[in-house]
């Protein structure tokens, strides 16, 4: 992908942002515990979520897609597949299915691509194994491929050392299908799972950072959901609007869950003009976000990191365009994403002539005039999209940009729609 420096403001109302990836995954996986037909509108059709759909099929789900709407009927009993369950680059697919399948009678093998198979899985596998799960993998169960000999698990209590929605959801799924659990985390991670499962009839008691999950006594009620648009995917355009003078972008039908808009709040602290307009709420609050240009100033960020971990690469681009030195800390989790994002962000910004210091748990970036560069994203969709946005300031070539399709196939199309000059 080649991006040319922008010579005019970006102005658009965008309604075709990618549907929320987190909720799309969960809608598919939770449907496997339901009875009846699940109806999922505005599903995200991207490589990551399609892996979850295909795994659900291999586990016995009847899946039909009509005019973009996904209909899922769960099997009466999850089927033991005769093949490997391929997760591609999707850590969400692998970790959530680990939790579900650890509590299901049968033998299952989960694997991913070269990048996913190097990401840590013990954070999910270890607590499950302590209560009777049988999960085997490379490096003592920390790396895929993973073999799971599923079965009913005992009641368990688990105090997580990290705020991770994937870990939390995996353990909730295992508990629902077994004897229940008590779960706590150090700070609130994304809470889509608790909200969706409670709406589907799960008995989950929420008290601050603590959950009590009771085992299912009957199948969950089927979902009927319209998935809102993804604020993480939309955030690239928000950053674009704040760094290109005169720009104004309106993002329609966005998920406004407070655990998902923290990065927008950081942009607001940096001086950006941002307005939220809530419109409706069923499973989650949905509304519009309006962003218009304003000069950005430096900021220090060290709290609620789990709420903006996916947006951190794009925030780094905002930091690079701000006046002063910005700092992100307590974000060590970035090192075990699709790439070592701390290292790759810092390498990329240095290539662009930006003064950046790599920290163990984040980075320090002094804003300045970025220079054109050729960026290698190391198979990481969020790195590729973030540097594409910086390219609007200075010009950029993103090598191997096809990785963007894992989460946001229409990214380039929408960039053109809002007035950017790019070549795929």
Swiss-Prot record:
Database matches in SUPFAM superfamilies: EPT/RTPC-like (SSF55205)
Binding-site residues for 3-phosphoshikimate, renumbered to this chain: 21-22, 26, 164, 166, 310, 337
Ligand binding (phosphoenolpyruvate): 21, 91, 119, 166, 341, 382
Q: Give the active-site positions.
A: 310 (proton acceptor)
InterPro entries cross-referenced by the UniProt entry: Enolpyruvate_Tfrase_dom, Enolpyruvate_Tfrase_sf, EPSP_synthase, EPSP_synthase_CS, RNA3'P_cycl/enolpyr_Trfase_a/b
Task: Identify the Pfam families for this entry.
Answer: EPSP_synthase (PF00275)
From the UniProt record, list the reaction(s) this protein catalyses. Answer: 3-phosphoshikimate + phosphoenolpyruvate = 5-O-(1-carboxyvinyl)-3-phosphoshikimate + phosphate
One of its GO biological process terms is: aromatic amino acid family biosynthetic process
Give its E.C. classification number: 2.5.1.19
- What is the enzyme's class at the highest EC level? transferase
Matching entries from Gene3D superfamilies are given as: Enolpyruvate transferase domain
Q: Which UniProt keywords apply?
A: Amino-acid biosynthesis, Aromatic amino acid biosynthesis, Cytoplasm, Transferase
Which CDD domains does the UniProt entry name for this protein? EPSP_synthase (cd01556)
Q: Which family does it belong to?
A: Belongs to the EPSP synthase family.
Q: What does this protein do?
A: Catalyzes the transfer of the enolpyruvyl moiety of phosphoenolpyruvate (PEP) to the 5-hydroxyl of shikimate-3-phosphate (S3P) to produce enolpyruvyl shikimate-3-phosphate and inorganic phosphate.
Q: What is this protein called?
A: 3-phosphoshikimate 1-carboxyvinyltransferase
Gene name, Swiss-Prot/TrEMBL: aroA
């Amino acid at each position: 992908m080649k991006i040319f420096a922008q010579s005019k403001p970006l102005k658009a109302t965008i309604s075709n942002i990618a549907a929320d990836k987190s909720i799309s995954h969960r809608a598919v996986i939770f449907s496997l515990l339901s009875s009846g037909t699940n109806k999922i509108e505005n599903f995200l059709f991207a490589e990551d979520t399609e892996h979850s759909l295909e795994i659900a099929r291999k586990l016995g789900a009847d899946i039909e897609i009509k005019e973009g709407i996904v209909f899922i009927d769960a099997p009466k009993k999850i089927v033991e597949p005769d093949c490997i369950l391929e997760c591609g680059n999707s850590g969400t697919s692998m970790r959530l299915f680990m939790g579900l399948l650890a509590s299901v009678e049968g033998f299952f093998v989960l694997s991913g691509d070269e990048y996913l198979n190097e990401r840590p899985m013990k954070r999910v596998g270890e607590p499950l194994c302590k209560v009777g799960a049988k999960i085997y993998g490379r490096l003592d169960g920390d790396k895929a491929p993973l073999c799971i000999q599923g079965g009913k698990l005992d009641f368990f209590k688990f105090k997580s050392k990290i705020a991770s929605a994937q870990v939390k959801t995996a353990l909730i799924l295992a508990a629902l299908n077994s004897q229940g659990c008590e779960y706590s985390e150090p700070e609130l991670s994304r809470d889509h799972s608790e909200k969706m499962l409670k709406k589907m009839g799960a008995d989950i008691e929420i008290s601050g950072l603590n959950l009590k999950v009771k085992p299912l006594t009957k199948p969950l009620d089927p979902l009927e959901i319209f998935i809102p648009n993804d604020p993480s995917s939309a955030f690239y355009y928000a950053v674009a609007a704040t760094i290109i003078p005169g720009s104004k972008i309106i993002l329609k039908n966005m998920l406004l869950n407070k655990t998902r808009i923290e990065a927008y709040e950081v942009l607001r602290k940096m001086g950006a003009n941002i307005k939220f307009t809530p419109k409706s709420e069923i499973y989650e609050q949905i509304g519009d976000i309006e962003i218009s240009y304003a000069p950005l100033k430096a900021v220090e960020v060290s709290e609620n990191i789990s709420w903006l971990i996916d947006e951190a690469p794009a925030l780094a681009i905002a930091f690079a365009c701000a006046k002063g030195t910005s700092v992100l800390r307590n974000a060590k989790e970035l090192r075990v994403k699709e790439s070592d994002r701390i290292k790759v962000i810092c390498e990329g910004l240095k290539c662009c002539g930006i003064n950046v210091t790599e920290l163990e748990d984040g980075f320090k970036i002094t804003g300045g005039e970025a220079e054109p560069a050729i960026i290698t994203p190391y198979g990481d969709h969020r790195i590729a999209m973030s540097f594409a946005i910086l390219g609007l300031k200075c010009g950029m070539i993103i090598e191997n940009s096809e990785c963007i399709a894992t989460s946001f196939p229409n990214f380039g199309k929408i960039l053109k729609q809002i007035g950017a000059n790019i070549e795929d």
